[in-house]
Amino acid sequence: MGDEDWEAEILKPHVSSYVPVFEKDKYSSGANGDTFNRTSASSSEMEDGPSGRDHFMRSGFSSGRNLGNRDIGESSKRETTSTTGGFGRGKGFGNRGFLNNKFEEGDSSGFWKESTNDCEDTQTRSRGFSKRGGYPDGNDSEASGPFRRGGRDSEYDQDQGSQRGGGLFGSRKPAASDSGSGDTFQSRSGNARGAYKGLNEEVVTGSGKNSWKSEAEGGESSDIQGPKVTYIPPPPPEDEDSIFAHYQTGINFDKYDTILVEVSGHDAPPAILTFEEANLCQTLNNNIAKAGYTKLTPVQKYSIPIVLAGRDLMACAQTGSGKTAAFLLPILAHMMRDGITASRFKELQEPECIIVAPTRELINQIYLEARKFSFGTCVRAVVIYGGTQFGHSIRQIVQGCNILCATPGRLMDIIGKEKIGLKQVKYLVLDEADRMLDMGFGPEMKKLISCPGMPSKEQRQTLLFSATFPEEIQRLAGEFLKSNYLFVAVGQVGGACRDVQQSILQVGPVFKKRKLVEILRNIGDERPMVFVETKKKADFIATFLCQEKISTTSIHGDREQREREQALGDFRCGKCPVLVATSVAARGLDIENVQHVINFNLPSTIDEYVHRIGRTGRCGNTGRAISFFDTESDNHLAQPLVKVLSDAQQDVPAWLEEIAFSSYAPPSFSNSTRGAVFASFDTRKNFQGKNTLNTAGISSAQAPNPVDDESWD
């Protein structure tokens, strides 16, 4: 067909006799509201990446998930105009298609109208016409360029001056605005639910225009905007029994009394031995008793009086040792004593305490603890995090917010939109502070403390808690803490919990899957977590285990928040007794009865290894950690692993010692980013007092590297 014939075909009124058959549930989430189950895909699909969807090849019909931009027709450098039904103005064709499952005004194409309670954004892109078809702006009938769909390329049209961005799968660069006609074509670049760019970002998808936007950059209110994230998490249980459901302590809980604790800094207050010595109010004491707390852990004995005294604190204690209660209880005691300012009757909420953690699951866990200890008081805790509806976060805040628990991206987004005030902030808490201050979230945390209205570090109390504090992180902490802050070191700082039996197995890459199946079948009904390094690998291993008749689910940053919460729920209740995870689940998560941790892939740093195996052996319970050591990729961890195993009084394999001290292993005390010495004591040189710690662990000499393939927020 020549150019003239093609133009005439477009411009003439046309009534197609073709009636597409839409499989209503083919790409939808289903009647029950469940989203796609990633573990049900074939192993070949998980290993090779997402496959292209079948699409209609007639006059702009396509499936709900196109893969980019591709010219239809013989010429890509010619302006066309549409004035009749079918093309443009969102009527059947074009970038609008179906909007909220109903037709635009004046549409008469005869398709059904559908209503659904499913909140997922898939409903606007998986039914009806493609949003990638036709012109990019349904209100501009003069838009330049032919109808484009499919494909994966990007080109710049010199004749028309318009830029069309296609982008490969997972493209991290949004199409730039053009310098000519003002039309920007943007590719969907793969499916919408697997499209996290990086640390704090979420996908903004919509009618013909997509954009990668960070929450901190206003990703939910961009000029180029599609359907917002609509997931609203279910409310937590309100009955008292559920609120105060507590973790069962293990047989080794009493051994905490023998752990060495050192406090460095000026004029540290003495430790307390019982909750009664803290002089907390009666309501707090009642809530502590209901939660099943009878004895203080070492970090609580020293941290509670320090926080009550108003001192800044950096506390380093092993995983599962009660750090959350160590900062929540004294903060609540202060708020109960001094009174609160925020209430639901104020137009602008100004929380007194802000708690920040790197992952959604961890911050929700902290919120539940805050809700537990504040039960029956006038203090109201609120949690906000990415992957949930932005309006839902605002509604939670305006109802009253005294303690704000947040992930960094959503917190900066809320602050940027002036939904909260910071003038009343008295307490700033960074949980998993080493991760909060490293390359992943360091810039955002610096923005937070420099926000207008945020009290200076001299006017607020700042608390940093983690299981690991490398020396570089301690230096960065100087920007957040007063110069006279106190440093609490509990036990072997940066070391692994001795309640965890560690085993290192030398397993090559091709044998790992079969070895994993063998271990899982031998442990019977015990509940294991399997850690891998990448999101793709997590889904692949989960699929493989399901094929081996082992019920498995997965959690990682590319799964929608609804799916992440469902996966954790299925794992907790035993519906899926095996959880395959990336570093999203490595820090802080407190899941009862996790008896095994299996490192299918070892992490890049020893600090991350300590956090991973800390998911078991919590609160005095015993656990086991099995790690697959690959001599082709894990040699940099040989020396730090030997040190961690020795400090935890674990058996060290002879072959591992050989690798650690061979000439092929990196030197132990170097400035390399892997396997160097990390600080196991207060690194300040100018404080008055004696630091008696004389043990040195081995870890990264600098901040832990952010996990390249993981979305933390």
From Swiss-Prot:
Record field: catalytic activity: ATP + H2O = ADP + phosphate + H(+)
Keyword vocabulary terms for this entry: ATP-binding, Cytoplasm, Developmental protein, Differentiation, Helicase, Hydrolase, Meiosis, Nucleotide-binding, Phosphoprotein, Repeat, RNA-mediated gene silencing, Spermatogenesis
Residues annotated as signal peptide: none
Alphabetized GO MF terms: ATP binding; ATP hydrolysis activity; molecular condensate scaffold activity; mRNA binding; RNA helicase activity
Gene Ontology CC: chromatoid body; cytoplasm; nucleus; P granule; perinuclear region of cytoplasm; pi-body; piP-body; ribonucleoprotein complex
Chain intervals for the UniProt region annotation (Disordered): 23-240, 689-713
PROSITE patterns: DEAD_ATP_HELICASE (PS00039), HELICASE_ATP_BIND_1 (PS51192), HELICASE_CTER (PS51194), Q_MOTIF (PS51195)
Family the entry assigns: Belongs to the DEAD box helicase family. DDX4/VASA subfamily.
Assembly and oligomerization: Found in a mRNP complex, at least composed of TDRD1, TDRD6, TDRD7 and DDX4. Interacts with RANBP9. Interacts with RANBP10. Interacts with PIWIL2 and MAEL. Interacts with BMAL1 and CLOCK. Interacts with Tex19.1 and, probably, Tex19.2. Interacts with RBM46.
Official protein name in the record: Probable ATP-dependent RNA helicase DDX4
